[in-house]
């Protein structure tokens, strides 16, 4: 399905080169997501995953994403995600018609159930963003189930990559599927259902590849930084 593949695009903001991924779904799609723009469940014509600089200064990320969408000619309702990770290093995996695309940046990671209380204030842009597209319609419950399944697969992949964490504080998940119309749609998307299992495997492979690649990039950057420090 054409809408299942994201398109990598470039832009400049304040003199800095940045990238974003766009899924031009068109009519007849529903999305369930934790996106900062257009989150929740409903019809969505597009999905945007935009890179922003580290130390993101703006306090209106939803408006910022809407501006990027407008510049790309994206009309109608959509879902917008944000990340400080290198979007050009995105990873993709496929399984039985399900496509998972992930942008990974794991510099600020930890466990969901941390002992300290949350800050309650705005957080830095999410660093593990997952976009999943399916070729079959899902019921409302199955869409929510699919987001949970994707999250479980993400944590499994991070552990398999040797990371002691469940993710980063601002990870986001976005699941897109055709509108069921008068049909109820697939009722289940848990990890032991047909489509949930395919989703889980695709997400696991994409996150695992992204986590390993991210670790290698961090190690290379760290070595370069150490090499630039004058030795006593």
Describe each model-derived feature in a short phrase.
Residues 1-232:
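Alpha/propeptide regions of enzymes that mature by internal proteolysis
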């Amino acid at each position: 399905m054409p809408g299942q593949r994201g398109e990598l695009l470039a832009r400049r903001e304040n003199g800095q080169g940045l990238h974003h991924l766009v899924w031009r779904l068109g009519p007849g799609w529903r999305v369930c997501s934790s996106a900062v723009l257009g989150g929740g469940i409903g019809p969505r014509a597009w999905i945007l995953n935009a890179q922003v600089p580290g130390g993101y200064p703006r306090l209106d990320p939803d408006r910022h994403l809407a501006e990027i969408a407008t510049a790309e000619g994206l009309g109608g309702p959509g879902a917008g995600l944000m990340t400080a990770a290198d979007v050009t290093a995105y990873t993709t995996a496929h399984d039985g018609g399900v496509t998972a695309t992930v942008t990974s940046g794991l510099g600020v990671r930890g466990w969901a159930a941390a002992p300290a209380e949350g800050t309650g204030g705005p957080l830095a842009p999410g660093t593990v963003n997952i976009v999943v597209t399916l070729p079959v319609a899902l019921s409302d419950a199955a869409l929510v189930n699919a987001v949970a399944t994707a999250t479980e697969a993400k944590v499994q992949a991070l552990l398999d990559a040797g990371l002691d964490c469940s993710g980063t504080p601002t990870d986001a998940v976005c699941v897109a599927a055709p509108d069921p119309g008068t049909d109820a749609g697939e009722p289940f998307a848990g990890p032991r259902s047909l489509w949930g299992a395919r989703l889980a495997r695709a997400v696991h492979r994409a996150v695992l590849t992204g986590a390993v690649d991210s670790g290698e990039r961090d190690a290379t950057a760290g070595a370069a930084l150490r090499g630039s420090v004058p030795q006593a």
